[in-house]
């Protein structure tokens, strides 16, 4: 039996395993992944030509291994192949390669008792091999199971249908380069749709790009740089976080002093000034693209105009290939439709809800996102571990969470009144559709059969991925090993309800998955304070407020925590 099995060999899985082994070097740790190479989103199977990371060089790495800059583009963009190579280097340096089993897709995870005592049993698809572990760390995150909408007529459709996740598969790359594939329909408006359209145009195809009229609209794409600085860096500043209302307070307080003064006690004038600052930033991001200069451009305008950056009705992205806008505005090889696909016909026709038909579609690429649920848990187990589920809570638990939801929504809008200005109030939701994870890592309550035996890393979508994943991995390690004190279940549940209520009010796109775009540094601060670590890593207050936070700023944080634990043991605390 393994001490720990980590499901997923991407960014989260590698750092979670490395951190656990650093704390428990004699532990038997196994990492399993269904792909043929490590990397998760950045595995070889998911890389395709011209794909580059949104994060700027120096921000897309872990604190204990700088990325080799030889393959980085002159403007700081990181090719996808360089990201994959970095993760292989990381796994090699920390002796993880020999602990990884690839081509092992886990189809079932369950908690059971037996001769081995209470443990987790993982069943691999195909072989039905069973793996057993005392503890599991789930790192498959929020982009693991592809979502393809129901497309009536798909079985008879003579063209091909695939998810954007498959664009890097060798057979897909070969098909796209095939001259017989001339016309492609791309469905979706997220960053992955922009990347897919760029790939197809570079391959010489013509594209009909279909984006639903409803929903959050197309992603707001920021330029590579703003005022001479890479736009992605703005997210790594505490200054930006100060302008975002969030509930991640200091110990013993629900809001920090700044949040209390600026976002809680302030009047309408302060809220107006805050929103004005965000609108100015929004304008600087939108201005380079000239949305109104063409019919195609107008159809890509963010849903909320100058309020799109603050409220984020759709996920934000960095326009890693700005030359795509020339193709968009010319309209010669790409045409954008604000419509929905209602069906497919045998003769390669794609039907839209407006009644229009797109003919000769050799390929349909669905850039339509991901399932929020993790199917390797049974429906009732999904709810037990804190994940959204298709099953329902028992009536008592359901009423408890509904009451907590209502109370939390009232409290969060009273404490952060600017959130009452949300232009699209959150719709009623099943409480079973929420993630019920304390700190987005641990289940809401521990039962005798689940006590500190499972943790999650990568279940909060942010712009500071490596920094967040390292903090979550250390928190998860401390939690699983019993070195971290956590509140009793009722308090954990109240805090979970608060953060869920905040996300629904703060980020419109956070109503599908947990989201903290501009607030990840305060979230990381909270995790490190839980662990007894000072999260302020800069040399002075000016640098702390205005400086750029990089992963390197947190170098040595695991060793620091281990030293603190050893000191506690020596002192008998």
Swiss-Prot record:
Gene: resA
Signal peptide: 1-17
Matches recorded under PANTHER family: DIMETHYLANILINE MONOOXYGENASE (PTHR23023)
Keywords, in A-Z order: FAD, Flavoprotein, Glycoprotein, Monooxygenase, Oxidoreductase, Signal
Natural source organism: Aspergillus sclerotiorum
Pfam families: Pyr_redox_3 (PF13738)
Function: FAD-dependent monooxygenase; part of the gene cluster that mediates the biosynthesis of the tetrahydropyranyl antifungal agent restricticin that acts as an inhibitor of CYP51 and blocks the ergosterol biosynthesis. The highly reducing polyketide synthase resH, the short chain dehydrogenase resG, the cyclase resF, the FAD-dependent monooxygenase resA and the enoylreductase resD are required to generate the first stable intermediate desmethylrestrictinol.
Gene Ontology molecular function, alphabetical: monooxygenase activity
Keyword Lipoprotein: no
Lineage: Eukaryota, Fungi, Dikarya, Ascomycota, Pezizomycotina
Keyword Flavoprotein annotated: yes
Known pathway: Antifungal biosynthesis
Similarity section: Belongs to the FAD-binding monooxygenase family.
Binding site for FAD: 106
Name of this chain's protein: FAD-dependent monooxygenase resA
Residues bearing carbohydrate: 235
Domain of life: Eukaryota
EC number: 1.-.-.-
Cofactor: FAD
